């Protein structure tokens, strides 16, 4: 039973597996990032929601690859994250988590919303700028 695995060496993915094709390697990396997203984002999102008093408002946390959004919060309490965000620095991931969880309190981008975001994630402008500058590098 040959095992598939992903190693990261010097910011490079090293994919190990039996009879690897480009498509198979891509699938291995996608599953790796999805699993990493679940392990990293879910506890942080639920912890922040608990801190903000909105943990009961989360009905689900989902992960999917989207073309234009890094995250989304529905009016029904579903938090959705693009698992490609796991290729960003942890500080940027934490900003995205904060942004979507704060929508559970404010379903808009009002002054109240941004004040709340800044209270749990200071310097959020820096992370927004990072995403604007580097987001094209995170897609594959």
Feature locations, PLM:
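Active-site-proximal or metal-binding-adjacent scaffold patches in catalytic folds
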Residues: 1-95, 104-140
């Amino acid at each position: 039973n040959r095992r598939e695995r992903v190693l990261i060496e010097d910011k490079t993915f090293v994919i190990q597996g039996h009879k690897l094709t480009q498509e198979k390697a891509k699938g291995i990396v996608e599953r790796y990032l999805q699993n990493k997203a679940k392990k990293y984002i879910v506890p942080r999102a639920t912890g922040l929601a608990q801190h903000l008093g909105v943990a009961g408002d989360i009905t689900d946390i989902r992960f999917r690859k989207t073309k234009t959004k890094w995250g989304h919060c529905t009016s029904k309490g579903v938090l959705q994250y693009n698992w490609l965000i796991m290729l960003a620095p942890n500080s940027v991931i934490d900003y995205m988590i904060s942004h979507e969880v704060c929508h559970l309190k404010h379903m808009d981008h009002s002054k109240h919303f941004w004040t709340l975001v800044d209270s749990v994630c200071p310097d959020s402008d820096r992370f927004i700028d990072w995403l604007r500058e580097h987001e094209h590098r995170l897609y594959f």
